[in-house]
A protein has these predicted regions:
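Short, structured "edge-of-domain" segments at secondary-structure transitions
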Residues: 1-253
């Protein structure tokens, strides 16, 4: 949908309809809802990562355009998803014209975060030989799901945020460059412990920092707060419990 169909509004408003969603077709089926929102140019590449750890690639112009209130098309009509797969995260690679090969830069990395607190870093160039039927992006244990994927230059600070409002912040390299927190490893491999979770807790998001970054945390019931990235304690090593980023209550959801 063209961005011109949307307008800037103040916080606290009702907003306007961004998409018509599909209602449940029976008692055993849930109604559809929006999970991902991003902007991209027509010739950019979209990297779709699924909950089972596979990756699919499409160009933006290959996705049919629809009005702001249109229902759109099922992603399964565009990607050869397997029966159990759903989209967990999307990365955008900016088109480089005749030099599209340059998008798969050797100094860029894909950082994965899974439901059980595992993280993995893999060189972006390992994904350039993609196939229509998808490729393995990360190996997952049974019962674990891929939750979020971000792009990094290998020298970022990472924040892992959990369902119960915890946040673990650590640097990719750590204090000792000879023994980094996150080493680049192969595509079809599992990862390492990123955060220690309490019983019943799980990862909901992963972000990396930029200069003067602010962290926006939004709860299920629409409460949000903005905090400077530096207010989160930097852990010397990955795998810690982190600190509270939001007190989760009945009010927040």
């Amino acid at each position: 949908t063209a961005t011109a169909e949307y307008r800037v509004q103040g916080r606290g408003g009702k907003g306007l309809k961004g998409m018509e969603t599909r209602d449940a077709q029976g008692e055993d089926e849930a109604s559809d809802f929006v999970e991902h929102l991003f902007s991209a140019h027509l010739h950019d590449f979209l990297l779709f990562f699924t909950n089972t750890g596979r990756m699919y690639v499409e160009r933006v112009y290959q996705i049919p355009e629809a009005s702001r209130t249109g229902k759109g098309r099922s992603i399964k009509n565009m990607l050869n998803l397997r029966a159990e797969e759903k989209i967990a995260s999307v990365l955008i690679l900016k088109a480089q014209g005749a030099e599209d090969e340059a998008m798969w830069a050797a100094d860029k990395y894909v950082l994965f975060a899974t439901k059980d607190g595992t993280v993995k870093k893999t060189a972006l160039e390992e994904f350039k030989n993609y196939r229509k039927d998808g490729i393995i992006a990360i190996k997952l244990d049974e019962g674990n799901d891929l939750v979020d994927v971000v792009l990094t230059d290998g020298n970022k600070e990472v924040c892992l945020v959990t369902h119960e409002g915890m946040c673990a912040r650590f640097h990719e390299t750590g204090d000792d460059p000879t023994s980094p927190n996150l080493r680049p490893i192969g595509r079809a491999t599992a990862g390492v412990r990123g955060i220690t979770l309490d019983d019943g807790d799980f990862i909901v998001s992963c972000i990396t920092n930029e200069p003067d970054t602010m962290v926006l945390v939004v709860s299920e019931n629409g409460l949000g707060k903005r905090t400077a990235f530096d207010e989160y304690r930097l852990l010397a090593n990955r795998g810690g419990k982190g600190v509270t980023t939001m007190n989760v209550t009945d009010k927040t959801g």
